[in-house]
């Protein structure tokens, strides 16, 4: 009844094709990382964090956001120096050219606003006090807090689910979790007195829509005098 889990473009296309006949968790796109950094983290660490998503796929998205222009330059230098040592150099280079960016924000507030607009799959808060700003992050699949919390440990062993919303869908969806394997039913039970009270409202609304059977179904149980049909005196 439901298909869940990650996959490549073929899996995503298949899930989209059967949606409506069965349930799905989400249609996931290429991997994404957004790093918000105050400029005090080792630039080699940040460069490798960007590589960690870029090596997945040539369409992967890797973005660094900082309000320290000198730090952006240092990370750019780290990327240039470290890239030739990567086994997936060609894939990483293609991804960074196509969907990589280093963005200079005005300040921390501007960086948070941009991060919420991007709504990334993975968000690293590589700052001195991530607890002070995490409450202002509204849209992100998984949030990695502090300089030592690399996205890679979330991929493999830190514990969060690795099936995360991509392509800005973190604005309205969440990581795969136990609630994706549950469903709910609404329960309604009215007493005779309750039916009599609610029938008055239901009758007026139903007759206003011209749905007489709805109205009379409620009126029978509530012993309500039928409301006048719209337009009739």
UniProtKB/Swiss-Prot annotation:
Q: What is its EC number?
A: 1.1.1.23
Give me the Gene Ontology terms describing cellular component. cytosol
EC top class named in words: oxidoreductase
Instruction: Give the Gene Ontology MF terms in alphabetical order.
Output: histidinol dehydrogenase activity; metal ion binding; NAD binding
List of catalytic residues? 121 (proton acceptor), 122 (proton acceptor)
Family listed = Belongs to the histidinol dehydrogenase family.
What is the protein's given name?
Histidinol dehydrogenase
Q: Which organism is it from?
A: Thiocapsa roseopersicina
What does the organism's lineage look like at the top? Bacteria, Pseudomonadati, Pseudomonadota, Gammaproteobacteria, Chromatiales
